[in-house]
């Protein structure tokens, strides 16, 4: 009929819809729309997931950096323990730190441990700009290593050094108190001091006495055997 528009469904069917069911065409259209919406939601979720993952990674990196800085700050706050480079005896710590002398390569401490022996023989300093300073030599009580000196008398311009212990950087080693990463004594270098030397010498003397006793018994046995041979 003229003037009657040809109706088409979503599949392109004309007239009364060759699909046979207008409801099915409508459902198909709605299904496509929902699939499109689901696809958009999926893309949006992926975008959010990507953004969240990126933010999580940034937060993780930030946390690691913060932890590293906190650990470094804590390490700086921990005191240093100064050891004799010869026998690893503790000599002092940074809690008694006064200053460092770059020109003489020394550190100045207010006090030291009992492992530092002070030679009471006084002598004048021969260092430049220390004219008039009276010094006493410092040695390690364990291995007798020369550690430095202590200022006993000073001119007026060096009064701040009086009674301070000056330890040579070359004669000492240090480690951070509470640090488990660094060993006080290296694996390939055993701790050797005066006490261990005395124990070793004592053991050697005992072994020597045992060897002498065995040698005497061997000599007696050889003498008896030789006498028996001659008699027969």
UniProtKB/Swiss-Prot annotation:
Coiled-coil regions, chain positions: none
Pfam families assigned: Yippee-Mis18 (PF03226)
Xref: InterPro entries: Mis18, Yippee/Mis18/Cereblon
This protein's name: Protein Mis18-alpha
Record flagged with keyword Ion transport: no
Similarity-based family: Belongs to the mis18 family.
Gene Ontology BP term (one): CENP-A containing chromatin assembly
Subunit details: Homodimer, and heterodimer with OIP5/MIS18B. Identified in a complex containing MIS18A, OIP5/MIS18B, MIS18BP1, RBBP7 and RBBP4.
KW Hydrolase (keyword) present: no
Gene Ontology CC terms, in alphabetical order: CENP-A recruiting complex; chromatin; chromosome, centromeric region; cytosol; nucleoplasm; nucleus
């Amino acid at each position: 009929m003229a003037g009657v528009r040809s109706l088409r469904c979503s599949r392109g069917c004309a007239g009364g819809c060759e699909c046979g069911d207008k409801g099915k065409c409508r459902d198909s259209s709605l299904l496509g729309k929902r699939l499109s919406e689901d696809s958009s939601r999926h893309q949006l979720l992926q975008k959010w997931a990507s953004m969240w993952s990126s933010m999580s990674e940034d937060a993780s990196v930030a946390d690691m950096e913060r932890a590293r800085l906190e650990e470094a700050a804590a390490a700086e706050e921990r005191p240093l323990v100064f050891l004799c480079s010869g026998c690893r005896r503790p000599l002092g710590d940074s809690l008694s730190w006064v200053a460092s002398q770059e020109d003489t390569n020394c550190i100045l401490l207010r006090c030291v441990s009992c492992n530092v022996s002070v030679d009471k023989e006084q002598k004048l300093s021969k260092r430049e700009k220390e004219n008039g300073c009276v010094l006493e030599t410092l040695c390690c009580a364990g291995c007798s290593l020369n550690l430095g000196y202590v200022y006993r008398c000073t001119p007026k311009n060096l009064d701040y050094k009086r009674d301070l212990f000056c330890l040579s950087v070359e004669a000492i080693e240090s480690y951070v108190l509470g640090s488990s990463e660094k060993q006080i004594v290296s694996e390939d270098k055993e701790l050797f001091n005066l006490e261990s030397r005395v124990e070793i010498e004592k053991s050697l003397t005992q072994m020597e006495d045992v060897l002498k006793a065995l040698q005497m018994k061997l000599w007696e046995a050889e003498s008896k055997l030789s006498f028996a041979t001659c008699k027969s």
